[in-house]
């Protein structure tokens, strides 16, 4: 029974730490770039776009397909940075827990 109490205590501590991390992630801002910096997209920790910058040289009708690709690439880079930041923050919390390799937590 002592083991179960200990597990429940650790789970509650982990839940509190995860809430703290989620609160911190809201304030996180990361920027993904593409085309050597011609396009940049800034996301917050909830994957919401807060800023898009496009170099004026790309705003030409004949360049629209390139611009679309660069916007997607910049967005994907920024999302990957958010995922990496969350993984780094949760790694310390889940250390020592019997979580199988590759298992994704619902909040990460």
From Swiss-Prot:
Gene3D superfamilies: Nucleoid-associated protein YbaB-like domain. InterPro entries: YbaB-like_sf, YbaB/EbfC. GO terms for cellular component: bacterial nucleoid; cytosol. Transmembrane segments: none annotated. GO terms for molecular function: DNA binding. It is found in: Cytoplasm, Nucleoid. It holds the Pfam family YbaB_DNA_bd. Keywords: Cytoplasm, DNA-binding. Its main location: cytoplasm. It comes from the Bacteria. Homodimer. Binds to DNA and alters its conformation. May be involved in regulation of gene expression, nucleoid organization and DNA protection. Belongs to the YbaB/EbfC family. PANTHER family: NUCLEOID-ASSOCIATED PROTEIN YBAB (PTHR33449:SF1). This is Nucleoid-associated protein BARBAKC583_1239. It comes from Bartonella bacilliformis (strain ATCC 35685 / KC583 / Herrer 020/F12,63).
